[in-house]
Amino acid sequence: MAINVKREGTSHEARFKSEALKRGLDVLVPEGDYLPYDCMVVNGEGTKIRVQVKGTSYRAKGSKAHRLLAGCGKTKAALDPDLVDVLAAYVVPADVFYHIPVRRLEGARSIYLSPSFGDSRAKYEVWKDAWSVYENGGFHE
């Protein structure tokens, strides 16, 4: 069966929402898909954090890292930190989310994630499973 990108994205978003709810976070989903974020996470203090959810299974031949296209829209423009707070990047084979503050992407349209290596010092590893970005009064870098 051919991969349906929209279906796959919906699956990643559902996984994110389920995990967020398990952690006591509320998730608001806008009607339609015209906004630059997929959902808003509301923490226990009522702070709203705008989240774009992306997922990847892709790993380049010979590479240990998974490549994720972090851009959005038809042009895959870089996420705008004035419009989106956090990129929730799901690496399917490792079943793990990275919660990366969009400002930390520094305009990158694609990123590499290395969840299979526990001792990795790759740029975004500090954000692996970092659900804490949604807690304690809201989004903190």
Label every PLM stretch briefly.
Residues 1-35, 40-141:
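Mixed-charge (Asp/Glu-Lys/Arg
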